[in-house]
C-alpha cells in the first residue's frame, strides 16, 4: 500500500472523522496523512480535510479525510460535512468513558446525514494510555459488532493501528464499490468539487463528472 | 468542640461565644407572584437583618415562586445578642430564667421582597429566627426551611418558606479574606495613625460634612454649580438605596472628616456651615450625606470595619498632607496626595492657598488645582465647591477608569513620567512646589492641565449617562458621576469602588443597568496596572482622569508601602524622583487589582459578579453568532470549492 501521487488515483473516498471533542480526531488525521502528532490540545475550529492516496490492489484510492470539531451543538455544516461521505471513523477516547457513552448519539447523527451504506469504524483512540483505560476493549468490540461497525483501538501518539484503521475502512469502501460496480474499475472519482453537488448515494458510486 | 473549649479555658466549656453569625440564604419556595403580566412571577430578593445590620441578596428575576440565591453574609452579633446566646448556652447546662428576656436582641429577620421597577418593593414574606434558639441547638451549621409570614398584624396567608443556613462563628473567620490580609499588612502600619485620627474623629459630623463637600466639588469644576444640586440629589437617592455606595461615600466622608478634623478642625465647622448655607444643593448633599454615613455603618458591619481600616489608611494620608503642609513627611507625602486633595478642599484656607497646597501636596489635586482657581473666583462658594471639585475630578477619573481601565493606568503612569516638567512648571506658578515632590502629585497636576480637555470629554460621557439623568446637563451628569465615585479618590482601591458605586448609583433603580452600559461595565473592575500603563501615553482626558484615580490609588499604595514596607516589596526598591513614583504607581496598580475588591461589600461583589456573568453570556452569544457565521461560510465553501479546506501540506516537522 504505497502512497500514490496526488494526481494519480482511481477513486476518491470521502471519509469523515466524528466523535466527541478531545478524542484525538485531528491527531489521527495528521498521523495518517502527514505522520504528525501534536501535543497541542487545542480543539479544532472549523472544518478541514487532508488527503492521502493509498494503493488498494491495483487501484489508487485517494482518501479525503474530513475533520471538524466534535461539538454537540447543531452546526450548519453538519449536513454538508456528511454529504458524500462513504466512510466514517467514529472516534472515542478509551480513557474517557463519557466519549464512548455518546457514541450512539454520533451514530444517529451519522445515519441521519450520511448514506446508509457508509462504512463506519468505531475507533478507540489513545490506546497508549492503557493505564487510564475506562472503556474495556471487549465492550467496545461488542458494541461495534452489534451495530455493524468495524472496530480498532488506535494510538495517534505512537501510531498504533492508525494506518490499519484508515486502510481497513478504505478497503471496506473499496470492496463495496467494487461489488457494486462489478467490473468497472475505471476512474470512479468522488471528486469534491464537481461530484459533491450531484453525488449519488452509495459509496464509490459517484463518478467524476468531468 | 472539645478543642475549642480547651483553647478557651477562661470561658469554660459552656462558654463558647460566637462573635458572628453567618447566614446563607439558600432559596425560597412557594413565594407569591407579584409581577403584573405573565404568570405569577416575582423578582425576589431577601433582606437579611440581625439587629441593625442588614444585607440584601441579589434579585432573582422572574422566579416562579422558588428563587435560589445561595448568598451569604455575616453579622457581628450585637452585644445584647451575645448575652442571649450566652444565657442560652448556660441554659443548656441548667435553667436560665433570664434567657427569654434577651432573646429579642438576637433575632434574624428574613424579609423577602419583590423588586418593583416602579414604586415601592412589595412584601413577599417575612421569617424571624431566634438566633439564641438556633444556637441553643448546637454550634453546628443549621440549615432549615422557615415559614414566611405576613407582616405582623396583617392577615396571615400562605407565603411560602425560605431555606437558610445559619452558622455561628467566632472571631473574624466569617469576615472576608481581605480582612485577614488587611490585618497583616496595611492595618498595622496605619493603626497608629488610625488611633490618632480616631481621637480626633467626630464621625457623624465629619462624615456628613465630608460627603457634602465631595459632591459639591464636582460642580465647581464643571462650572455649573446650579446643576450640582440635581446631580447630587440624584446620586443621593441612589446612595440611599444602595448601601454599598453609601459605604464608599461614608468612608470618603470619614477620611475627609478625619483629615479635616486633624488638619483643620476649625475649617470643618465653617465648611459645613457653608454647605448648609449654600443653596439647596449643598444642603441636600449634606443631609443626604449625613444619612448615608449614618446608615452605612449599620448596614455592613464587617465590610464596614474593613472599610474603616481602609478609611483610616486613607485618613492617614490626609493627615500626612496636613503634616506636610506644616512639615514635610517623607513617608506621608505620597499618601497625602490622595486624601490630601480632600483635605485641602475641606480646609478653610483662602482659595488661593488651597490651590497651592493642593497642587503641591495632593495627586488628586491636579483637578483640584483647576478647582482651586475657580475657587478663588467663586469666593465664598469656593469652600463648598472645592470639595466637590476634588471629588469630582476623582470621580470623573474613576469613571474613566471604568471605561478604560487599562488605558487609564497606562495614562496615569505616562503622565507621571512624561509630564514631570510640566507638572513642575505648574507647581511653581502655584507657588507650592516644595511639597509637590511626590510623583503622584505631578501626575495629578498633569491631569489638572488636561482638565480642560477632560471637561470636553466629560460632556460626551455625560451624554452616555443622559439616559439615566434626563434633562440634566452634561456637566451635571459629570458631577453626578463624580458624586457617586466620591469614595474613589481616597484609596487606590477606592477608586474602583467608587466607580462601581457610580454604576450602582446609576443602575440602582435596577441592578440591570450596570450590565447594559458599556461605559459602566469596566469601571467596577480594578485598574489593570501592568499592561495598560506603558502602552498608552496619549494625553486623552480619560487618561488624565484615570491618571488621577490611579494617582490616588497609588498614593494610597505609597502610604501603605511607606508605613509598612512589607506590603509592597516592589515599591521598596528605591528609585530616584518621578521614576520611582511611576513605578510605584504601576505596583500600586497591581495591588489595586485586588485592592479594589477590598472595600466591596457582599452586595457589591455579587452585583459585580452578576454583571460579569451577564457580560459573559453576552459574549457567549456573540461567539455563537460568529460560529454560526463561520459555519455558514464553511458550508458555502464546502459546496462550492471544498479544496480550500484542504490542510496545506506543510513542511514536515
Swiss-Prot record, chain B:
Tell me the GO molecular function terms: gamma-tubulin binding; small GTPase binding
Location relative to the cell:
Cytoplasm; Recycling endosome membrane; Early endosome membrane; Golgi apparatus membrane
Question: Entry's InterPro entries?
Answer: C2_dom, C2_domain_sf, FIP-RBD_C_sf, FIP_classI, Rab-bd_FIP-RBD
Does the record's keyword annotation contain Cell cycle? no
For bias kind Polar residues, which ranges apply?
A: 277-286
Membrane: present as a keyword of the record? yes
Q: Which cysteines are joined by disulfide bonds?
A: none
UniProt feature, compositional bias: Basic and acidic residues = 375-387, 420-430, 447-460
Topology in the lipid bilayer = Peripheral membrane protein
What broad class describes the main subcellular location of this protein? cytoplasm
Alphabetical UniProt keywords: Cytoplasm, Cytoplasmic vesicle, Endosome, Golgi apparatus, Host-virus interaction, Membrane, Mitochondrion, Phosphoprotein, Protein transport, Transport
Output compositional bias ranges, type Low complexity: 357-368
* Residue span(s) of domain C2: 5-146
- Would you kindly state one Gene Ontology biological process term found in this protein's UniProt entry? regulated exocytosis
Q: What positions belong to coiled-coil segments?
A: none
Q: Which residues carry this modification: Phosphoserine?
A: 176, 283, 286, 307, 357, 367, 391, 395, 494, 538, 547, 553
Which stretches of sequence are listed as region Disordered? 269-300, 342-402, 415-548
Pinpoint the FIP-RBD domain residues.
Answer: 586-648
Gene Ontology CC terms: centriolar satellite; ciliary basal body; cilium; early endosome; early endosome membrane; Golgi apparatus; Golgi membrane; intracellular membrane-bounded organelle
Tissue localization of expression: Detected at low levels in heart, brain, placenta, lung, liver, adipocytes, kidney, spleen, skeletal muscle and pancreas.
PTM summary from the entry reads: Phosphorylated on serine and threonine residues. Phosphorylation at Ser-357 is PKA-dependent.
Record note on domains: Binds to vesicles enriched in neutral phospholipids via its C2 domain. The interaction is favored by Mg(2+) rather than Ca(2+).
Q: How does it assemble?
A: Interacts with RAB11FIP4. Interacts with NAPG. Interacts with RO60. Interacts with RAB11A that has been activated by GTP binding. (Microbial infection) Interacts with Kaposi's sarcoma-associated herpesvirus/HHV-8 protein ORF45; this interaction results in the lysosomal degradation of ORF45 and the inhibition of viral particle release.
Additional free-text comment from the UniProt record = Antibodies against RIP11 are found in sera from patients with autoimmune diseases such as systemic lupus erythematosus (SLE) or Sjoegren syndrome (SS). It is also found in the sera from mothers of children with neonatal lupus erythematosus (NLE).
> What is this protein for, i.e. what is its function?
Rab effector involved in protein trafficking from apical recycling endosomes to the apical plasma membrane. Involved in insulin granule exocytosis. May regulate V-ATPase intracellular transport in response to extracellular acidosis.
Task: Report the protein name in the record.
Answer: Rab11 family-interacting protein 5
To which species is this protein native?
Answer: Homo sapiens (Human)
Q: What is the lineage of its organism?
A: Eukaryota, Metazoa, Chordata, Craniata, Vertebrata
What gene codes for this chain? Answer: RAB11FIP5
